[in-house]
């Protein structure tokens, strides 16, 4: 009978926004502050929520377009930095871990799994967020897009995260919420699990994950299933 002990020594990589933490409220708030500073109308929460997860520049590009003023390429770097500053100042005003996250991470760590964050968010923002919501102690490393050879969906990002904690892709799982996570896992030769409660515009069942789960409490069972019964997929590296 499979148990949590089967995950001893395994590496589990987690996306951050929309997977571990519901960050949309603070990201939407920061975007709307920038839009207001540029004399543009605020955007509805539900619209912006689906724009989250591809990095600050992508969020600003989509947000400005939705507000009726495409982002000017020359002004973009300064606006991105201003957005980051605004967001960092309120990074966990309303953000919180999804239900079950703390319990599951504690169980996985106790079982001996190596836990790492693999996110397209900048590393400094990621660590600040994890500190603010008290999740940092669970993770051995945080690999943001700026620390990877290329960001997800490039498999080298997932592979770099696994390597950062001394893991092996042959005994690793990627947990995320988007097509970038599913493809990043597949391209690294790692089985991928997607949660259904995150930030994606497409039906999560269509994104090519090995498993889809509807509660974070199902993460351990999904990892055990994939690591004990399924060979690792062929790497695209």
UniProtKB/Swiss-Prot annotation:
Pathway as given in its UniProt record: Organic acid metabolism; glycolate biosynthesis; glycolate from 2-phosphoglycolate: step 1/1
Similarity remark: Belongs to the HAD-like hydrolase superfamily. CbbY/CbbZ/Gph/YieH family.
Enzyme class name: hydrolase
SUPFAM superfamilies: HAD-like (SSF56784)
Protein name: Phosphoglycolate phosphatase
Family matches, as Pfam families: Hydrolase
Matches recorded under HAMAP family: GPH_hydrolase_bact
GO biological process: carbohydrate metabolic process; DNA repair; glycolate biosynthetic process
Cited function: Specifically catalyzes the dephosphorylation of 2-phosphoglycolate. Is involved in the dissimilation of the intracellular 2-phosphoglycolate formed during the DNA repair of 3'-phosphoglycolate ends, a major class of DNA lesions induced by oxidative stress.
Coiled coil regions in record: none
InterPro entries for the chain: HAD-like_hydrolase_sf (IPR050155), HAD-like_sf (IPR036412), HAD-SF_hydro_IA (IPR006439), HAD_sf (IPR023214), PGP-like_dom2 (IPR023198), PGPase_prok (IPR037512)
Cofactor(s), by name: Mg(2+)
Catalytic activity: 2-phosphoglycolate + H2O = glycolate + phosphate
EC number: 3.1.3.18
Gene for this chain: gph
GO molecular function, one term: phosphoglycolate phosphatase activity
């Amino acid at each position: 009978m499979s148990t949590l002990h089967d995950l001893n020594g395994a590496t589990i990589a987690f996306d951050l926004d929309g997977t571990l933490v519901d960050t949309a409220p603070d990201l939407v708030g920061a975007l709307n502050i920038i839009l207001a500073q540029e004399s543009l109308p605020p955007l509805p929460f539900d619209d912006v929520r689906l724009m989250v997860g591809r990095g600050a520049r992508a969020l600003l590009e989509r947000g400005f377009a939705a507000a009726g003023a495409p982002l000017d390429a020359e002004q973009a770097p300064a606006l991105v930095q201003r957005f980051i500053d605004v967001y960092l100042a309120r990074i966990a005003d309303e953000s919180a871990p999804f239900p079950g996250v703390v319990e599951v991470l504690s169980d996985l760590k106790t079982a001996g799994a190596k836990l790492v964050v693999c996110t397209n968010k900048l590393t400094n923002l990621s660590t600040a967020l994890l500190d603010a919501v008290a999740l940092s102690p669970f993770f051995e490393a945080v690999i943001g897009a700026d620390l990877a050879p290329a960001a997800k969906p490039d498999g080298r990002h997932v592979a770099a995260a696994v390597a950062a904690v001394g893991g092996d892709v042959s005994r690793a799982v990627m947990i995320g919420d988007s097509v970038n996570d599913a493809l990043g896992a597949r391209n690294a030769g790692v089985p991928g699990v997607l949660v259904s409660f995150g930030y994606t515009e497409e039906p999560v069942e269509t994104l090519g994950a090995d498993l889809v789960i509807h509660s974070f409490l199902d993460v351990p069972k999904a990892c055990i299933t994939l690591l004990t019964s399924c060979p690792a997929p062929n790497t695209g590296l």
